[in-house]
Amino acid sequence: DLRTVATDLRNRLREEEAVIVLGAQDKGKFPFIVAATDKAVERGVKSGDVVKQFGQYVDGRGGGKPDMAQGSGSSAAGAERGFAAVEDMLESL
């Protein structure tokens, strides 16, 4: 599942300043997850804020903790634009 993959990637990248954003179409829905390493959180990344930003593009919502948050949307159509918006958001930190 997405949480397992995100956790595994975060653990592999734990020495880096990294943010993982994953999503997948599943039975007409679009679940997504954000995981941030400790260094990214120290820099000011809040996974819940990233989920909110991404959620706007997939008609979704969600929340969580600074290091991991998840949500679900109803449309994958805007996912590509959502990933681009998240990238812009993170570059501005």
Model-predicted segments: where are they?
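Glycine-rich, acidic loop segments that terminate in or are immediately followed by a histidine
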Residues: 1-93
